[in-house]
């Protein structure tokens, strides 16, 4: 029986029509209503169906879903060792044991562990699909179905590893001799079967009605989207420019529906990212919401804390992992902040270094947490059961259960319950042996597979639900953000190990079937009083068209000679005129000029006054990365130390050997992997530097001093007390007795030559010359160490004159700053590209 669309019919009236159709048919069949069964697509349909039958009066049939009725008729049999448990992470370990002895699996596991784990996940996914499909078969035909599936897969040998895995999955599912809980449905004998179809046929219900010996009625409520010229719903469409506009418009649409009395409102979770933002916006309004979709356990605070704990314990002693866990699990404190600052300042990367330090900030907390995770230390292979026991000990008093999602995390990981004796879960937990990395990966898989659904908020005015579960429910309006071609109408993905043709032949889910099911769910949404569709018009720089389902609806209207049913959504928020409020530019507060300026501070002031303001007046700086790869500046710092050690301790004899010895001394304590590229660069530099040094010394040049800390007071008047300071890499004397400033550089010679071409733009050497009193006989040069052609000295001509001009310019600029002159963001090019304050100055937002 077809239950199509009736103009003007609301959902409650529709359900009364269903109740009437059932009652009339049962009477015609002479079947007892109270002994009949009406199978509904989802548990959410039970309440409106009951209301409809109660309104009609008299006996009503048993209202159930196939799952709830099967559960009522008897428990599901327990999975025995070796059988499919339905728990994907546990079954992945069982599948590992299942194929571990096969030669191809051993080779894949050895050569590409990641590909092997992916193969296990696909095997489990396919085995679960076969098990579900088998449970939907008539028990008498199940054996024949398995044989037909096996024959189909073996007849076509194309597929290689994928086909082999699919056959293993099929054999695993077929070897399960348990009686599925759904078999009780085939033994049940009601007075009549009635099945309500919405969103496509239910294979189990079809098999049940086809194989029974009692009267059966199939109520088909599905709508043909291509024939829906005049939907019941008022369909509104909102076109949005970007993500935030989409989220705000969606929240406004929900609020407008509620203000108009259209409650409850279904917020369709088609695009979970957008809906998460919409939920946050609605929460600010204090609006109660019930989320039927939930989210993965891995995204809950409890899971984040647990994974941080495991990364700290099993991450090889990385300080970054330990700090991440401490900041999640401990109360914020100044001592903890000081500990992090210490680690970043000294680039401490290993937890063992902190263990050996005395008078550590937050030392009591550090030692207590290190001791707490001792049960997990080592990372050697253990049984999964032992890992879980040790994890439970490590958690100790950790208030995981008090965090959102904590109870679900503890249950999913078997930390708050025990597996049934003799079950598949107990066997896997006892037999599987994992190392620390394997256990960490398994916990991550469990949390990704688990779902966290918040507690039911009762009669909430907003219900967040998937499109398929919004069908035939008494919502006042539906709001669907993400009605674009990338999000709505594409369907889900098919099975990884089977082609579309194979899946279709075996009755397994296909992409085509999922697309059609989504189209049918969208068509059912057109029964609602109002359907508000919202979408972005662009994805980045690319145009983003409407969903093909919307296009099909518009085509159906045109085919029937009607106007498009889509109406423009009206944002009822009153526009607000915003008066520009210019903010004063940053300036130096009275007496807040730094007591001392370095060469880098002067460079910041000249490159961008706002950069100087943020770095040297506000004291802002980017936090050092603990686990960052060594940078070129780190190599430069190390090389400075090597050359200083070499020159200050140089003895007559082989310069190459002495320089290599200095490098070895400065390398002590460095991570070997980090030092390796430095060693290679240094070996290339070694002969070049020795050659340059010999040539320079042959001309009478000699090392005088290095790493020289200097300061001076070059200004007068109100700036007389301002100190200029810096560290000079090296000072040599020439054959004429002049002093020569040398600054080591590992950059390109071309860049250095470009710098000294405009001497007044070279701040660094001018500042160093001021530090050396800007004597007229002073010379200066950059020493380029990394040029393939050899070590090259790039001279800064007449550096004393440049220093004098720099001093005069700084005197003028600094006096203006003291008088309140603004410090605007005037930087350009590389000054902005590598600036830590970018974004703070808001220059990127200037229009």
Question: What is each of the regions a protein language model found here?
Answer:
Residues 172-175, 185, 206-208, 217, ...:
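Intrinsic disorder/low-complexity segments
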Residues 190-241:
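Conserved RecA-like helicase ATPase core segment
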Residues 2-66, 70, 74-83, 224-789, ...:
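Anion-coordinating catalytic cores for phosphoryl-, nucleotidyl-, and glycosidic chemistry
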Residues 142, 215, 288:
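Residue-level detector of anion-binding/catalytic polar loops
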Residues 40-189, 199, 203, 337-367:
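Basic/charged alpha-beta structural segments of nucleotide/phosphate-handling enzymes
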Residues 162-164, 168, 193, 731, ...:
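Hydrophobic alpha-helical segments, especially transmembrane helices
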